[in-house]
Amino acid sequence: MKVTAAIFRNGDNVLLMRRGADQPLAGEWEYPGGKFEDGEDGPTCLHRELFEELGIDAEIGDLITIAKHTTDSGKVIELHTYEIKSFTGEIQ
C-alpha cells in the first residue's frame, strides 16, 4: 500500500495529528497524509488528502524520502514523505 505524509515546518516546530479513538492505533501521533488513489502520483495524493483532512490548499514541495515498512500482518507500506512549501486556508 502506498501512502503519503506531509512535513510542515515552522522554525523548530512541525505539525502532527493525533489519531482518533475510532481509528487503528488510536491516540498515536502521525504526520498528515493518506493513501494513494488509483492513478495518483505522490504530490496529487498529498494535496487531496490535506484538503480532505485539514481543509487547506497546500503547495507540495520536494520529496524527502520513500520508506518501506512491513507490518506484523505482512502488509508492505510504502511511505512517500514531502515537504510542504506553503498553504492557504486555516487548518481545521
Question: Which stretches of residues belong to each language-model region?
Answer:
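Conserved N-terminal beta-strand and adjoining loop/helix that marks the start
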Residues: 1-15, 35
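Active-site-adjacent beta-strand/loop module that shapes the phosphate/pyrophosphate-binding cleft
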Residues: 2, 10, 57-59, 67-91
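Residues that recognize and position ribonucleotide moieties
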Residues: 7, 29, 75
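Surface-exposed, flexible loop/turn segments at secondary-structure boundaries
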Residues: 14, 22, 69-71
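A conserved beta-turn-beta hairpin within the catalytic core of GNAT-like acetyltransferases
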Residues: 23-27
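The catalytic Nudix box helix
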Residues: 31-64
